Amino acid sequence: MLAAGMQPAEAKTEDGKWLIYLSLSYSGNSWQSEAANIVKALAKTPPYNDTVELVEVISGTDPQSQISDYESMIANGADGIVSFPISSNALNRTVRHGCEQGVLFFMYDATVTEQCAYNVSYITSGFGENTAQALVNELGGEGKIFLSRGVPGNSVDERHTNGAMHIFNQYPGIEIAAEYYSNWDDRTTQQETSKALAAHPDVDGIWAQAGEYGAIQALLQADENRLVPMTGENSNGFRLALANEEYQAKGLSGVSAGSPPAQSGLAFKLMMEMLEGERDELPEDQRNIQYPLPWVTADDVKLCEGDTFEDGCNTFPGDKVPSSFVTEVFNPELLPELSLASALEGTPTPGATIQPLPADVIENAPNEPGINCRNCDAPENLYELTTVEPTVSP
């Protein structure tokens, strides 16, 4: 039974299924594969396996290519598009056109500033500033550091770096010796970090986005007995390294935070609940939805014995998943349908059925000009620390 005021939309395929597009831009790393697999697994989970036709489209890193693909999806009668957008601004006109045609746009992780789209993202939860402060704390406020960034021009990379620089600029003793784009990929991060180490072998710390395990490999390749404090994202290899006593003795310390692939699953389920009339659509000025920031120190690393996050575990044994596997694929409260095979292969969990999201699942994200809104004012406490406290004064 539908709640009062909720009316289901009408599916557009000939067989009565919802036509849903999974639109990727950059797709060259484990995170992107896992996020896409989560959506695929959910779409194959009853009852969606009988009601959803899911079509995956990979556009690449050229905004014009994703614009063209969006236009084709709209023309083909899409009911919904769940997407990792390549640009926060370049896609806006096409997104608005799609909204006017009745298409629901749900962006995950990366964001757009067209307010008719839903942005489901941890981007505003403070990764950049909190991890930067954690690194400053580890270094005692002084030292040479590298910045290992993501994909040029993407809103996620820009927001992370802006937040980090807000902190680093407060500490005159912090010197940014090298800054490079690593495309959120272990191999590229290792290559770019190795280049930076050739020029600055005395680096004291590394602030990294996804691909951080590659930075550890570059450090060990340069000097097998020397590691440095690092902050990074959620790769399984990085979490295992943080908890490795041998690596700690060589100098490794830090925190694992960053982007959960599970954001894609929340975006997909929210979109489906709205299409099915189980949840009201939100006013356009309330469509920025915040996903919480994971935060795991060496002391917090706990190995999982099974194929899901249970009993507070957050990392898998090294012989179970690749080092590049992004751990934050599960959310037992929001995505109980998923298992390890869902993230690795896009397959549904045997016996699982789609469970409704909690009624109060939506947490409004703050507006950030150029990131998730246009013609809006940023909050005064935009880069306020929310997870870590300074232990050294600027």
Protein language model regions, located:
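Short beta-strand elements at the ligand-binding edges of bilobed clamshell
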Residues: 58, 112-137, 147-152, 179, ...
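An alpha-beta-alpha
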Residues: 20-29, 33-41, 129-179, 271-308
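Hinge/cleft segment of the Venus flytrap/periplasmic-binding protein
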Residues: 2-17, 268-394
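Extracytoplasmic "Venus flytrap"
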Residues: 5-6, 15-47, 53-67, 84-88, ...
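Hydrophobic alpha-helical
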Residues: 71, 75, 79-100, 164, ...
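Flexible loop/hinge segments that line or gate small-molecule binding clefts
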Residues: 88-126, 144, 237-241
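Hydrophobic alpha-helical segments within soluble ligand-binding/sensing domains
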Residues: 5-6, 66, 120-145, 159, ...
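Structural recognition of the beta-strand scaffold that forms the well-ordered cores
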Residues: 20-24, 32, 55-56, 80-84, ...
